[in-house]
């Protein structure tokens, strides 16, 4: 009985006695003098390294290979049908890479390619056109009512500019305010009358303050010059 037990232990590769211990591995390293890793030494001793041997073995059998091949064929057919239905570039225009039709305009696709929205800085030209249109549509009436003969005479026969018109309108309003205490309306729009009245008041007050300051400066210069001359005479 003991002989049978020893034989079965030697024949069975999974028995504990067949597995090398750490002492045996160390002794093998010392005796051989080679630098084998732990796994390599276990493989040399024909020991089982714990891996997927139990899972791999049934897959290599003939029935499992047949079933896997059949499953692969059916799955590939299903995937191919799905791809042809969903990812068809001819019917749906789905491009996984940049197609050659986008490089040339003759072969361009029929569907329109959407351009990105322009930012505020890129669309200045469109905004300026819109502003010009809006200003031309909502032009004030008092510009057309200004006498063009005065502007043309001052600009030597050229067309009257907006600056010239504004200057003449201010000059006319100043003359009106200096001649009469009240404000006479020249244009039919009340908003323009109020604006020109306020502008004339501000300009007249600023001009008077400038004139006063200039006169005071001249007086100071005269006084200082006279004082300097007196000092020189006394010397």
Curated annotation (Swiss-Prot):
One of its GO terms (cellular component) is nucleus. The modification Phosphothreonine is found at residue 191. It comes from the Eukaryota. Residues 1-34, 58-83, 169-235 are annotated as: Disordered. Residues 61-77 have a biased composition (Low complexity). Residues 1-14 have a biased composition (Basic and acidic residues). It is found in: Cytoplasm; Nucleus. The modification Phosphoserine is found at residues 180, 187, 189. One of its GO terms (biological process) is meiotic cell cycle. Residues 15-34, 176-202 have a biased composition (Polar residues). Involved in sporulation and has a role in meiosis. This is Meiotically up-regulated gene 123 protein. It comes from Schizosaccharomyces pombe (strain 972 / ATCC 24843).
